[in-house]
Swiss-Prot record:
Highest taxon above the source species: Eukaryota
Record carries keyword Acetylation: no
A GO CC annotation given for this chain: phagocytic vesicle
Organism: Dictyostelium discoideum
Positions of region (Disordered): 512-539
SUPFAM superfamilies per the UniProt record, alphabetical: Chaperone J-domain (SSF46565), TPR-like (SSF48452)
Intervals holding TPR repeats: 3-36, 75-108, 189-222, 235-268, 273-306, 307-340
Domain J positions: 361-431
Name of the featured protein: DnaJ homolog subfamily C member 7 homolog
């Protein structure tokens, strides 16, 4: 095989991007031609340039200069040497070799274009100050990458690119870039600082701390590392302090410490999402549930995959009776942690609570807690039934009267369920007596019957007997159906105004196991009357 065939074979390898094979063939061509043909050196220089390692670029420059030496008019020798110098960030040498070519051929377009390219790169680099780049990171990153595509080993731009990547929150990319630089210069304080910064924003505090400390070891005056180290330690200290206060149940102090930690570096998102979640936990114990929800929202806004914050917010939503929101948060947490069986139970509980919330809340209607016992429920019913009974509100405007009647109906429904142990248990479980979802309407309940039975049985267990209730004449209790109040005391009339209002004079109540005459019969006889002035007045 002669040198021309070796060159042709090398060109074929070059076209296939098999540069090492191309170099081997070009080297054979050079040897077979006794190193006298400039184009062979030029071709090998192009292959070395394409590989673009630091050493291959040096080889490309060497071959390009040899080609120029053999043939001064070999223009590609000047341009390839220039490109290799540019990749090595040796811009003065690149400009110098182009000037040499222009001396030989002042109007050569390839050389003039290369000169313009060198000038453009240098202008761009001069304009890319750190302050300008960080103030407009997206645009600056495009400019930096454009220059680095032609000037691969400009370490100044590589460091600036890493800083811009950090500003754009592309922390792993920044860390990887600085790792490459540190492999060549492990004691460079700026390299150590910038990689430490990328680790810090990835919440890798121990390794970030080590980088900042090493940076200061090699340059005690490197101020950026000193500031970063102080900031890191402050955040760690305040977070630890907040956790300790929380463990000791000093929740206000914990809240204050977490708040201070959050103020140190607003850009420290991963850590801040944890701090928001921790502060939310303190707020829950301070019974500031709405604020806790806001902090959890801040946490998941920063880190949409922060499962613990979704769970904490769901728990807060349950406390606020925002059951649909709680279900959504629990389901999001489960999607992040499918193996967590507890979350499935949480979702079920939240869905049941949501179904319950669509019914009338009988506990709220009676104004009692869910832990209220029989006595408290009866007491609440007595008070509200007397307050909202239709006979008391007969003179109200129609709208208010309708509201009072609805309230009286709801009170009766509530008492009918909560006073019955079985119904109450089913209601608490979200079921009706047939095991189906509880129907809030309770349409089958006779509210007046509930009222009548309650007071017939003595309500709170002591009965209403003893004293007569005189002065109750006038029409009866509307809607109570003739029967009246049997068994409410032996023969004593109703004295005073048991419902806090005047029933007027007139006819009595028949069929109540003792006459309820207006001012006749036993209205003042038998047991002592409980008048509206008596100490045992019912209101």
């Amino acid at each position: 095989m002669d040198h021309e065939e070796c060159k042709t074979q090398g060109n074929n390898y070059f076209k296939q991007s098999q540069y090492m094979d191309a170099i081997r063939c070009y080297t054979q061509a050079i040897e077979l031609s006794n190193g006298t043909i400039a184009a062979y050196y030029g071709n090998r220089a192009a292959a070395y340039l394409a590989i673009c390692t630091k050493s291959s670029l040096q080889d490309s420059i060497k071959d390009s200069l040899k080609a120029i030496e053999l043939e001064r008019s070999f223009i590609k020798g000047y341009t390839r040497a220039s490109k290799a110098y540019i990749h090595l960030a040796q811009y003065d040498q690149a400009a110098s070799i182009i000037v040499r070519g222009l001396v030989f051929d002042p109007r050569n377009n390839e050389l003039l274009q290369e000169k313009n390219q060198i000038d453009s790169i240098q202008r761009t680099i001069s304009s890319l100050t750190k302050e300008k780049a960080l103030s407009n990171p997206s645009s600056s990153l495009n400019q930096i990458e454009n220059v680095l595509s032609q000037s691969k080993y400009n370490t100044q731009l590589q460091v600036l690119k890493a800083r811009v990547l950090i500003e754009l929150k592309q922390y792993p990319q920044a860390s990887n870039l600085m790792t490459t630089l540190l492999q060549e210069d492990s004691r460079n304080p700026e390299y150590l600082y910038v990689r430490g910064l990328s680790l810090y924003y990835q919440n890798n505090f121990p390794l970030a701390l080590q980088h900042f400390q090493n940076s200061l070891t090699y340059d005690p005056d490197y101020s950026e590392s000193r500031v970063a180290l102080k900031r890191l330690r402050s955040i760690e200290s305040k977070k630890k302090e907040g956790n300790e206060y929380f463990q000791s149940k000093n929740y206000q102090a914990a809240y204050d410490s977490f708040t201070e930690a959050l103020s140190i570096d607003p850009k420290l998102e991963t850590m801040n999402s944890q701090l928001y979640s921790n502060r939310a936990a303190a707020l829950v114990h301070l019974n500031r549930i709405s604020e806790a929800i806001n902090d959890c929202t801040s946490a998941v806004t920063i880190d949409p995959n922060y499962g613990k914050a979704y769970i904490r917010r769901a728990q807060c939503q349950m406390k606020q009776e925002n059951y649909e929101d709680a279900v959504r948060d629990y389901e999001k947490a489960q999607s992040l942690d499918p193996e967590n069986g507890e979350l499935q139970r949480n979702i079920k509980e939240a869905k049941i609570a949501h179904k319950k919330s669509l019914r009338k809340d009988y506990y709220k209607i009676l104004g009692v807690s869910k832990e209220a016992g029989e006595t408290e429920i009866k007491k609440a019913y007595r008070k509200l039934a007397l307050q909202y009974h239709p006979d008391k509100n007969n003179q109200l405007p129609e709208e208010e009267k309708a509201q009072a009647e609805k309230m009286f109906k709801d009170i009766g429904e509530a008492y009918s369920v909560l006073s019955d142990e079985k119904k109450k248990r089913q209601y608490d479980m979200g079921q009706d007596e047939n095991g189906m979802p509880f129907d809030a309407d309770m349409g089958g309940v006779d509210i007046n019957s509930v009222f009548s039975q309650f007071f017939n049985q003595g309500g709170m267990g002591g009965g209403m007997g003893g004293g007569g209730f005189g002065g109750m004449g006038g029409g009866g209790f509307g809607g109570m159906g003739g029967g009246g109040f049997s068994g409410m005391g032996g023969g004593g009339g109703f004295g005073g105004m048991p419902f806090g209002f005047d029933m007027g004079g007139g006819g009595g109540y028949g069929g109540m196991g003792g006459g309820f005459g207006g001012h006749s019969g036993h209205s003042h006889g038998g047991s002592r009357s409980r008048s509206s002035r008596g100490g045992n007045e019912y209101r």
